[in-house]
Amino acid sequence: MLAAPALALQARAQDAKPIVQQAVTAELAANRDDQSHWRYLRSEAGGNSLIIVETEHGAISRHVQENGRPASAKALAEDDAHIQKFIHDPAMQQKQRQNGEHDDKSAVELMNLLPQAFLWSVVSETPEMTTLSFKPDPNFHPPDMEARVMGEMSGTLIVDRAQHRIRTMKGRLESDVTIGFGLLARIKQGSTFDVERRQVAPGYWEITETHVHISGHALFFKTIGQQEDEVKSDFTLVPLGTTLDQAVGLLKGAAK
C-alpha cells in the first residue's frame, strides 16, 4: 500500500519536467518573434512612477509622481533635458541597446537552464493554470555564477495552460552562495525574487511585477543590497516605426 503513493509522486515529478520544457520553448519562441514596443506606467516602491515609451531606437521615460506626489516642474525639466540629450546622442542609444541585448542574452541562457537546474513537481492544476514547485537539483552543474545562484533557489512556477506561458516565478535562496571562499562574494540565504507576467494584449505577455530582495557582500565586505519592487501597468502598443521624437509626444500625452 505504501508503494502506491511513492509511485504517484514519482510519476508526478516525471510529468512536471515536460511542462517546464514546453513553457521554456514557448517563451523563447515568443521572445525571438516579438518585435513589439510598449508605452506603460512603471510604479516603484517609495511612491515614484514614470511613463516609459519604447521604440526600436531606444526607450525614454518621464516622471509622473515623486514620493507619492505629482512630479515637480524641476524634475520634469530634468527629464525633458535628458530625453533631448538621448535623442541626439547615438552613443547613449547604442549603450542602452547593448545593455538590453546583454540582459536579453542572460535571460535566454537562464531560461534554457530551467528544466535541468531544478527538481520539479506538480503542485496543483486548474483549467487555466498549472502550479509547479522546484528545488535545487544536486546533479546540476552551473556554467557560470548567475546560474549557480539560480540553481540554489527553491520556489514556485505557474504556467498558463492555454498558451504555455509563464505567469509567475518566485524563489528563495536556500543556502548562502559563496565565491572565492566567501572573500569575493557571498549572497545570503533567504534572498528572494518574485516575477509576475500577464497577457497585456492578445498573444503578448509582459512582466507586470518584479520584487527582488538580495543581500550579501562582495569584494572584501562591500555590501550587496539589491532591493527592487516595481509594478508595470497601463500597457499600450506603440506603432511600428515610431521615432524618438514621436515617442516624446506619446510620453507627454500619456501624462495628461
Regions found by a protein language model. Name each.
Residues 1-6:
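Bacterial N-terminal signal peptides
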Residues 12-154, 162-167, 172-190, 196-199, ...:
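Structured extracytoplasmic
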Residues 204-206:
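Substrate-binding/catalytic groove segments of enzymes
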